[in-house]
């Protein structure tokens, strides 16, 4: 992690969704978070719309990582990690 990287923080919901993932998926997601996402959160993800403003989504295989970027603190808050078919259902307005 370089000085320019963002710190990765976890919300309680983010930790719960990580704990429910299959071990191989969880390992790949954590590696992705602390390398690619921490280095460039705007580049690897896309901003969400329609009631989900302020959140971003990044792909990791069939899973999606939902996160919030805090530029002032140079921090990424992981909100949720779920399968792509389920991730947006519970978050729609």
Language-model segments: which ranges?
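A short, surface-exposed loop/turn module that caps and links secondary-structure elements
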Residues: 34-58
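Enriched for short, Lys/Arg-rich terminal
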Residues: 1-9, 16, 20, 24-27, ...
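Solvent-exposed, flexible loop/coil residues
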Residues: 12, 52, 56-59, 91-92
């Amino acid at each position: 992690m370089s000085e320019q990287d963002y710190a990765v923080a976890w919300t309680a919901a983010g930790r719960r969704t990580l704990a429910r993932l299959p071990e191989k998926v969880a390992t790949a997601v954590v590696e992705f978070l602390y390398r690619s996402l921490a280095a460039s959160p705007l580049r690897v993800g896309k901003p969400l719309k329609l009631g989900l403003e302020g959140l971003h989504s990044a792909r990791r295989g069939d899973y999606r990582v939902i996160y919030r970027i805090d530029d002032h603190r140079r921090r990424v808050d992981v909100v949720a990690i779920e399968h792509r078919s389920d991730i947006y259902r519970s978050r729609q307005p």
